[in-house]
Regions:
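…; additionally, a secondary subgroup of soluble metalloenzymes is captured
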Residues: 1-54, 61-170
Length: 170
């Protein structure tokens, strides 16, 4: 009974918050609000050619305090950027927004009731494999040697880091 009452109170609070948030977005007429950096604002810095090897850690929903702890433990030059998420806020859209997209941006289809994201000739950006295929095509060079991938879990288990100039950690 107590749990049910707590759930009802929480639902009411979250519902009011969601309504106010939707009102804000509606009033602004765009996202993110003026003066707030969006995911697209760091895109060029993420994927620009570096003078030396570079790693980009792409993670979903990492709290800023935890991101700072990770940054403190990394060696070498580290930059940490916090940006407003995309709308909608789920993983497929947020991760695709960080890719080196063409100027016209991604194309989104809701055919069959499920989101499908594509950019240029690459579809499936809503999946990790689709995002990897896109990055290989956009940054990998003729044989894909310009970019390597490693999963964060495997990296934490001491899997070797690819020798490529750009390493993307998912």
């Amino acid at each position: 009974m107590v749990r049910r009452l707590a759930d009802l109170a929480y639902f009411e609070h979250v519902s009011r918050f969601a309504d106010r948030f939707c009102d804000l977005v509606g009033r602004e007429g765009s996202w993110p609000p003026a003066g707030v950096a969006g995911a697209g604002s760091i895109r060029e810095a993420l994927w620009s050619k570096a003078r030396r090897r570079k790693a980009v850690i792409v993670t979903d929903g990492l709290r800023l305090d935890l991101a700072r702890l990770v940054a403190d433990r990394l060696e070498g030059e580290v930059s940490l950027d916090a940006v407003a998420t995309t709308l909608p806020t789920n993983t497929p859209f947020g991760m695709a927004a960080l890719l080196p997209l063409p100027a016209e941006g991604p194309a989104v289809s809701f055919a069959g009731g499920k989101a499908s994201i594509s950019a240029g000739e690459v579809s499936g950006l809503e999946t990790r494999d689709g995002r990897k295929a896109f990055l290989l095509r956009a940054l990998g060079g003729p044989k894909g040697a310009g970019v390597g991938f490693v999963d964060l879990g495997a990296l934490l288990q001491r899997q070797p880091v690819p020798e490529s100039p750009l390493v993307v950690v998912f």
